[in-house]
Amino acid sequence: MILFCVFAFVKGYAQTGQDDTKVYKKRVLETTEIDFLTSYYSQDGDNAAVTGGVGTEELTDVTGTFVVSIPLNDDDVLTIDAGISAYTSASSSNIDPFDDGPADPFQASSGASSSDAWANLTGSYSHSSDDRNDIWSAKLAISSEYDYFSVGVGGTYSKLFNEKNTEVSVSGNVYLDTWNPIYPTELRPFGAEGNGLSDRLFTQNTITGNTDYNPRFSEFDSKGRNSYSLGFGFSQILHKNLQGSLALDFVQQDGLLSTPFQRVYFGDVADSFIDDFQLADAVERLPDSRFKVAAGGRLNWYINEVLTVRTFYRYYFDDWGINSHTASIELPIKITNKFKLYPSYRYYNQTAADYFNPYEGALSTDAFYTSDYDLSEYSANQYGFGVSYTDIFTKAHIWNYGLKSIDLKFYQYDRDTTFSSSIITAGFKFVLD
């Protein structure tokens, strides 16, 4: 039903625009296109940040996205991107591990934090000059989930010259985000309006180990997180079979960069438990600013009609002490005029952030601390395989929309920690007849 309504709306709008416009030059986008994208993602591991670097990281996520591109005239294109993501998470369920049966960091608990939905709506507009050598674009994005809201604006300018063999671009984005902080259950009684160990949680449960439980906790003053990015791009056709590109990106983040529900355990504080669950000594505390720089390049080599080689490398560093390298290769293989295969491989490694410590590695005297293994030192390998089907004549139809292409891909990702994940993606492109 949703798909039918989207098709109906776009068809009516597009036909009106096409009827009123006389075509004197090649359009940037010939006709309305609709992409439907979906994915299924799963992960697991034993270093959950929610439980201080130990415990299950099990999570599953299902997404669905519509991307509608509408030619407004010869030069202008409006694109609307609407998506939703629904996940269930054993690790985030342990924000409140005391709601159903014995508490254990390696077992999921039930409750509101065990699942959530993320929704996103992005609108973008692009304009191309008559000679197609200048392209301007702007976007507005809004996304929301239970404890987070984000609004963003951005723009890009691209210039082509040297008979369109060379392209330079500059882009900028601003995202203004707001947290609705959710803290681990056992820490909430120690907030500004809490009553400490007199809270119902502690009177109805028995604390073992260190019974004089006294965490280091205060609620965050700031709830905002702002991100500002500036990017530069350069692309050059080096040969009829070879194309290269370079990119340089800068990101500045300010505000609440800590995740309020991620626990930390101190090595110099005696452990306190309810059931098998260790009570938090604190929540993650990170600096309120972060500066990131990434520089990379791509080289695509068209070997022949059957095989293409796509390579990528990026170096990244920030002022939290992380340095990383990413290298990847993809080998599109043309099987027939309609089918292609896409084997790929990506390697990644990074150093640890200055503020990372494993379980009970931080001290209560530290100013900043986290046990989020995304900020740890690790290496990762990702293997992928995809298949695409393309029908330029769009023989298959849904209503007045022809099916132009189908893309299916699978990726397996493994770190040298206990973390691993996999994702299956599917994309379907339709064009208006």
Question: Where are the model-predicted features located?
Answer:
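Short loop/turn motifs that connect adjacent beta-strands in outer-membrane beta-barrel proteins
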Residues: T16-T32, N73-V77, D130-N133, N162-E167, ...
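Outer-membrane beta-barrel translocator domains and adjoining extracellular loop/strand segments
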Residues: T21-K22, D46-G52, D81, S91-P97, ...
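Transmembrane beta-barrel strands of outer-membrane/channel proteins
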Residues: F36-S42, I80-I84, A138-I142, V153-G155, ...
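Outer-membrane beta-barrel translocator/channel fold
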Residues: N47-V50, G55, G83-L121, E167-K240, ...
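Residues on the lipid-exposed face of transmembrane beta-strands in outer-membrane beta-barrel proteins
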Residues: F66-I70, L121-H127, G155-K159, F232-Q236, ...
